[in-house]
Amino acid sequence: MAKIISFDEESRRALERGVNALADAVKITLGPKGRNVLLEKKYGTPQIVNDGITVAKEIELEDPLENTGARLIQEVAAKTKDVAGDGTTTATVLVQALIKEGLKNVAAGSNPVSLKRGIDKTTEALVAEIAKVAKPVEGSAIAQVATVSAGNDEEVGAMIAQAVEKVTKDGVITVEESKSLTTELDVVEGMQIDRGYISPYFITNNERQTVELENVRILITDKKISSIQELVPVLEKVARLGQPLLIIAEDVEGDALATLVVNKARGVLSVAAIKAPGFGERRKALLQDIAILTDGQLISEEIGLSLDTASLEALGTAQKITIEKDNTTIVAGNTTKPEIQKRIAQIRRQLEETDSEYDSEKLQERIAKLAGGIAVIKVGAATETELKDRKLRIEDALNATKAAVAEGIVPGGGKTLIYLASKVDEIKKNFDEEEKIGADIVKRALEAPLRQIADNAGVEGSVIVSRVKDSDFNTGYNAATGEFEDLIAAGIIDPAKVVRSALQNAASIAGLVLTTEAIVVEKPEKKAAAPADAGMGGMGGMGGMGGMGGMGGMGGMGMF
């Protein structure tokens, strides 16, 4: 495949054009008065969204050089989403401003490497400053964080706060689509473990790349399973019941895994397998936790139990199991409450006796997984388009809430970034001259999110930035009402983790763009043009379709 190579200023300008094309489409969604973006779908109805990451993912540019720039911004947005769960639009606006200011200075003769060093050192100092000013989140602040992130939807804010209260901050909260018109909160007992499917061939939902099983039997063992013969008795019993089966084992490999995959593909048995979580003694304890939660038994040779003699009573049960690439959620229902409480009490006693910080952390994690349960927010709406938009907003709000609980909160609405800009002059005192220019690039870029929030609200961004600069730490611009007020009191707050991640990821990619001297991309293939004079001939009649032979009987199940 032939390549296009671009150098120097030409390469950086191509990247900037790509960055601007994507960022301009994303940044109009920022703030309480952010506009919507309509996305055409190849199949189905167009989607109307107000979510930065969703817009960013949809954009692909025709020019391969510019598209490289766009993809860098997609990475900023995706990384921010992965780490903090929200703040993707803020990160996009920041990186666009950093690149714009930085490239001006590179074109004027500044050393890109020194600029990058200045940007990196300034960002590092500002991240420490965010940690200093962040306040712990408690009480009504949880609902306020969720409300702001959900586009000022107070119903969603209250629902997420309620979910956090019910399952504790250590519990698991998921968002699902509902068939009704209303959005509801449903709390069920459950556990999330950090192990995904052993083989992608177990996947049942191709769109989400997940395994989803309902009314499941669970085989829990600390053994490594390599021979299918060990599993045959259990598989036969479960196949007769017609229920899906989840196998949790040290590992499933060789012909055991191959046979399970083949029978799943043929539709003979709905089955999936995951590796047991943890290691050593902790693994056994976690498997015992899962057994108690699912009302099953840990099959271990240490207690005289083997796979080939396991009865159906030894298998755990779960209402629903969702297995992703890296984690598994088990919803067991409310069947074993007293046993769960006994187990939690036992772990708490261990927690009181341990002196090890590591052991203490792991024991608390186990209590959270047993006690926390799972809250499910079922999103309802009148149309599919509204449903998808509402679901995205709720997922953003949920992620923002988790981030707030993790690292605390700061004033929102771009105010914290303006405050950070005021600290840059102090930070850069010991920098060399070109590093100081890098620090100033960060200082100017930090104003961009507030400027954009104001522009989206239909007011002059420069005027708003100037007034907010002159106010105290908590006072900023409320774009929803057009007032300058105490943002914390008004409930306009951001999770510190979101602000930190947006700044770090934006600075990282901006530094890479500024120090880029060449781009190598694949040359697009030219599509063969149709012959100019070739009128389309009449379509020949379709021949009769031959009779379809009788379908052979389905073979017996391979493992029996």
From Swiss-Prot:
Q: Which GO terms describe its cellular component?
A: cytoplasm
The domain of life is: Bacteria
Where is this gene product found?
Cytoplasm
Question: What are the binding positions for ATP in this chain?
Answer: T29, L30, G31, P32, D86, G87, T88, T89, T90, G413, N478, A479, A480, D494
Q: Which CDD domains match?
A: GroEL
What reaction(s) does this enzyme catalyze?
ATP + H2O + a folded polypeptide = ADP + phosphate + an unfolded polypeptide
GO terms, biological process: protein refolding
What enzyme category does the UniProt record give?
Answer: isomerase
- Enzyme Commission number(s) of this protein: 5.6.1.7
Per UniProt, which keywords does this protein have?
A: ATP-binding, Chaperone, Cytoplasm, Isomerase, Nucleotide-binding
Query: Quaternary arrangement and interactors, per the entry?
Result: Forms a cylinder of 14 subunits composed of two heptameric rings stacked back-to-back. Interacts with the co-chaperonin GroES.
Task: Describe the task this protein carries out.
Answer: Together with its co-chaperonin GroES, plays an essential role in assisting protein folding. The GroEL-GroES system forms a nano-cage that allows encapsulation of the non-native substrate proteins and provides a physical environment optimized to promote and accelerate protein folding.
- Record-stated family: Belongs to the chaperonin (HSP60) family.
PANTHER family assigned = 60 KDA HEAT SHOCK PROTEIN, MITOCHONDRIAL
Q: What is this protein identified as?
A: Chaperonin GroEL 2
Species, as recorded: Trichormus variabilis (strain ATCC 29413 / PCC 7937)
